[in-house]
């Protein structure tokens, strides 16, 4: 069930403050964050976020098609190594 429109999108305050400060200065430095739950706003376009995936920070460059999604959607937490092929020789 989506979030109510009267509440607005959720964004951590510290993350919004960092983006606003960079927009005022005109900087586009990488912003390191653990806030995977924050919604991407139009103010974030053109910035690069280093989103934590539980092990490391994954760089995510924000473009206009990402607005409305969560930051965590673009930093996968699990690595899929493929299915193991059955070994018919070893089984008896």
From Swiss-Prot:
PROSITE patterns with a match to the protein in the record: RIBOSOMAL_S19 (PS00323)
**A UniProt-annotated Pfam family:** Ribosomal_S19
> A GO BP term, please?
translation
The cross-references to InterPro entries, in alphabetical order and at most eight, read: Ribosomal_uS19 (IPR002222), Ribosomal_uS19_bac-type (IPR005732), Ribosomal_uS19_CS (IPR020934), Ribosomal_uS19_SF (IPR023575)
UniProt KW keywords: Ribonucleoprotein, Ribosomal protein, RNA-binding, rRNA-binding
Q: Name one GO cellular component term.
A: small ribosomal subunit
Q: What GO molecular function annotations does the UniProt record carry, in alphabetical order?
A: rRNA binding; structural constituent of ribosome
Q: Which Gene3D superfamilies match?
A: 30s Ribosomal Protein S19, Chain A
The family this protein is said to belong to: Belongs to the universal ribosomal protein uS19 family.
Q: What exactly does this protein do?
A: Protein S19 forms a complex with S13 that binds strongly to the 16S ribosomal RNA.
Q: Which PANTHER family match?
A: RIBOSOMAL PROTEIN S19P FAMILY MEMBER, SMALL RIBOSOMAL SUBUNIT PROTEIN US19M
Q: What is this protein called?
A: Small ribosomal subunit protein uS19
- What is the organism of origin for this protein? Corynebacterium jeikeium (strain K411)
Q: Which gene encodes it?
A: rpsS
């Amino acid at each position: 069930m989506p979030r109510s429109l009267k509440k607005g999108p959720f964004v951590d305050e510290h993350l919004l403050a960092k983006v606003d400060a960079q927009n005022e200065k005109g900087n586009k430095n990488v912003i390191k964050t653990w806030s995977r739950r924050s919604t991407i706003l139009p103010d974030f376009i053109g910035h690069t976020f280093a989103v934590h995936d539980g092990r490391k920070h994954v760089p995510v460059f924000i473009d206009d098609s990402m607005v409305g999604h969560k930051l965590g959607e673009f930093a996968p937490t699990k690595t899929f190594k493929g299915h193991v092929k059955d070994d018919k020789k070893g089984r008896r």
